[in-house]
Amino acid sequence: MAENQWVLYLLKTKSGMLYTGITTNIHRRFAQHENGKGAKSLRGKGPLQLVFSSYAGDRSNASQLEYQVKQLSKQQKERLVICQPVCIAEYLASIRNGQSVRSK
């Protein structure tokens, strides 16, 4: 993966909480979260499960997509995980426009 290629991801905790983040290296970041060296909100909440990931373009675009996902309700995030959309940007746009969504 190129250094400037960002990934948006969702992790699920043992209690069912969904955490949204972005990274350039999903394997490294997941290991950091699992070892308690990632986000404070995930410490002690394991085991963690990677439930969604999608390429998100550059850092700016990834940050915008991350913000949009974080604004979704838990139900909408769970639907995102179930649908596993091919393009996260299109998926989020369809939610804003009230349209149905294509999945993988």
UniProtKB/Swiss-Prot annotation:
InterPro entries: GIY-YIG_endonuc, GIY-YIG_endonuc_sf, UPF0213_domain, UPF0213_GIY-YIG_endonuc. Residues 4-79 form the GIY-YIG domain. CDD domains: GIY-YIG_UPF0213 (cd10456). It comes from the Bacteria. Disulfide bonds: none annotated. It holds the Pfam family GIY-YIG. PANTHER family: UPF0213 PROTEIN YHBQ. Belongs to the UPF0213 family. This is UPF0213 protein plu4503. It comes from Photorhabdus laumondii subsp. laumondii (strain DSM 15139 / CIP 105565 / TT01) (Photorhabdus luminescens subsp. laumondii).
